[in-house]
């Protein structure tokens, strides 16, 4: 188990970055997913979209270089590439709902073995709402969940989500600091494992049946 929160997030973001392909239009959700833009190889051309109205979003700026008028969907400072563009949210969501986004990377509170996603509310707590997640999970061609494997020691990958769902059966891939899990028809398939953990540990921290790939390999970070 990796207890260093910042290290865990870095591992996840680096691995998700390796999942993206040259030329794709990619949406990054709020929080951890926005870190992915910092780890794209320089020879790759990935176009990042933010649902508040940016196409061509770049990496996070240095603190002394941040433009207070340029923020991503989570309200964090971001950069925009020279060929980037700004537009209103109606155009942004037309891109999403029209199926033009190749990949969306989202955080989650829970994911289950059916690919169901819960990422917008904990009953009894005040939250801002679902945001664009419900559009993204249905409009994007591939949905990657980027999240810590547990929350305060409790599994976030479950047999069945207990929180209100954002979408049913829409997650394609789950990336945590411990490994990479594909959502397949038979359930959850562990395809990559962090070199600092074991299959037994991952299973003990996962509240769902976990299939092990015959081609299980070290996590590529």
UniProtKB/Swiss-Prot annotation:
Q: Which SMART domains match?
A: CoA_trans (SM00882)
Per its UniProt entry, what is the enzyme's top EC class, as one word? transferase
Q: In this record, what's one Pfam family? A: CoA_trans
InterPro entries noted in UniProt: 3-oxoacid_CoA-transf_B, CoA_trans_fam_I, CoA_transf_AS, NagB/RpiA_transferase-like
One GO molecular function term of this record is: butyrate-acetoacetate CoA-transferase activity
Query: What pH dependence of activity is documented?
Result: Shows at least 80% of maximal activity from pH 5.9 to greater than 7.8 for acetate conversion.
Task: Tell me which PANTHER family the record gives.
Answer: KETOACID-COENZYME A TRANSFERASE, SUCCINYL-COA:3-KETOACID COENZYME A TRANSFERASE SUBUNIT B-RELATED
Family per record: Belongs to the 3-oxoacid CoA-transferase subunit B family.
Q: What is this protein called?
A: Acetoacetyl-CoA:acetate/butyrate CoA-transferase beta subunit
The species is: Clostridium acetobutylicum (strain ATCC 824 / DSM 792 / JCM 1419 / IAM 19013 / LMG 5710 / NBRC 13948 / NRRL B-527 / VKM B-1787 / 2291 / W)
Which gene name does the record give? ctfB
């Amino acid at each position: 188990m990796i207890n260093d929160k910042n290290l865990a997030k870095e591992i996840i973001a680096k691995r998700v970055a390796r999942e993206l392909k040259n030329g794709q239009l990619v949406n990054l959700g709020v929080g951890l997913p926005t870190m992915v833009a910092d780890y794209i190889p320089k020879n790759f051309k990935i176009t990042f979209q933010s649902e508040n109205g940016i196409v061509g979003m770049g990496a996070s700026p240095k603190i002394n270089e941040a433009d207070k008028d340029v923020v991503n969907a989570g309200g964090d400072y971001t950069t925009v590439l020279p060929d980037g563009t700004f537009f209103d949210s109606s155009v942004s969501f037309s891109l999403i709902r029209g199926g033009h986004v190749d990949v969306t990377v989202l955080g989650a509170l829970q994911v289950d073995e059916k690919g169901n996603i819960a990422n917008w509310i904990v009953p009894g707590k005040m939250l801002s709402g679902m945001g664009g997640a419900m559009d993204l999970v249905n409009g994007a061609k591939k949905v990657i969940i980027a999240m810590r494997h547990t929350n305060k020691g409790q599994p976030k990958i479950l047999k069945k989500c207990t929180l209100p769902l954002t979408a049913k059966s829409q997650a394609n891939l789950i990336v945590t600091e411990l490994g990479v899990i594909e959502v397949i028809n038979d359930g959850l398939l562990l395809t990559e494992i962090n070199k600092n953990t074991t299959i037994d540990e991952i299973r003990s921290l996962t509240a769902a049946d976990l299939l092990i790939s015959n081609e299980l390999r070290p996590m590529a970070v």
